[in-house]
Amino acid sequence: MTKIINGLSDVLDEYDVVLIDQYGVLHNGTIPYIGAVDCFNRMIQAGKQVILLSNTSHRSCGLPIKLGPMGFSTSFQGVTGGEVCHTYLLERPDTHARCSLMTSDLDGKVTKRASNPESTFHGLGVEIVPLDKAQFLMVDGTQQICYSDRVTEVLPTDYRHTGEVNDAMKEFLRGGLERKLPLLCPNPDVLAVMANDRFVHMGGGIAKLYEEMGGEVIYFGKPMKEHFEVCLRMAHVTDKSKVVHIGDSLHHDIQGAKNTGVDSIFIAGGVHARELSVNAWGTDEKQLRVKPDLLENLLERTQLDPTYTMTRYTW
């Protein structure tokens, strides 16, 4: 059974390498969680090798741009789903030259890709085309369906906020399935917790639906073991017992750590906060205390057992 700890300093001396998630652990997309900046910077000052491991569809160069202004040290390495997907496409210019796309921002990610190094499409010649000309589908966001690089032709969806699959999305998925197109998913997250503890629906939910329909999905990110192993190679790890992964998603972070054979620290106040009746923004003991019975029930349901658990990422 997982051990509940008060803060990272309780166990940090056990490890040399720390892999850490960002959303739900360090920040909510807008502001840092209470104590997170201090904890992160102390961790780096303690001489730990830190690798930010994120399911974002943005490339790794965007991590310090996001975290630095919040006060986090930028003395870390980074691996993102978008970065690994970019490498995958870069190595397959012939078989992955044309795609039909779901995204959050066609203009920024595709039309202006040359000036946006964070885009998965930066430096690539991938064309956005209709389904009958596509070699693959890609879901790197959930707000626009695109069959060309013209912003005026995007088909909007409200899946991010409602989780509802509209007719345009159904056509996108059915069209890919009929043509036996693989779907690339650089962010396997199904849900994410944002500002004001608001949940949004992510591309992983679309990929899961395509899989359930019988389609082929290629995931880039957690919980895929390959994603974690990129980090281990970057850190030149020879002893996995000296590595810990910190994250808030049992299905992605804790499952991925288990798949890879490394220890894990589960942040209860992230995406599972409602299930565990904790509040990472709380100021009193009642709001912050992880209730063992709720935690045990959740872990039993998911068949996962993180090495340690704490409410929020604090020192």
Question: Language model features by range: what are they?
Answer:
Residues 1-45, 56, 60-77, 86, ...:
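Asp-based, Mg2+/Mn2+-dependent phosphohydrolase catalytic module
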